[in-house]
Amino acid sequence: MTNSRMKGKNGELDACRALEKLFPFKWERTAQRYGKGKADIEAQCDWKIHVEVKRRKTGYSYVYGRLKSDNLIVSGSLLICRLSKLRTVMDDGVCLPNVAPRCAGLEDAILQARTDARVGWLPIVLARQDDEEWLLAWREEVDTRLMEEVRTWLDGNTKPI
């Protein structure tokens, strides 16, 4: 396995572990079972979210810097928060997050997620820079629907598959 493929695999496994700390169900890499055309990782429940995982050595430093003082930022058409702050963002009802310059890497990743997602599925991106925690990015236009879905998962109202 090449170094970049191993890094991708390790990033996906790490993302699964991070999501399992937040949500009450198991996560798995899909590449092991399905290959292309599916999300990088999927929850083992009835959810309709397409998760694209990106792990980079650098490239998100500005976003991490902005998220030191804010729980949620807007970057272009994306909303971005630290995965560990998702509950805070939902509970605080943050309405007007601070605007940050566009993050091309995250915009490209969400475009890939939108292209690969099945019809009716919400595309999101989990991204992490080395030595940092996971970022969660989603399009502003799906914010309400995503938050409703996430609240359902956090309440444990999902069906295992």
Regions found by a protein language model. Name each.
Residues 1-161:
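Catalytic phosphate/metal-binding cores of nucleic-acid and nucleotide-processing enzymes, i.e., regions
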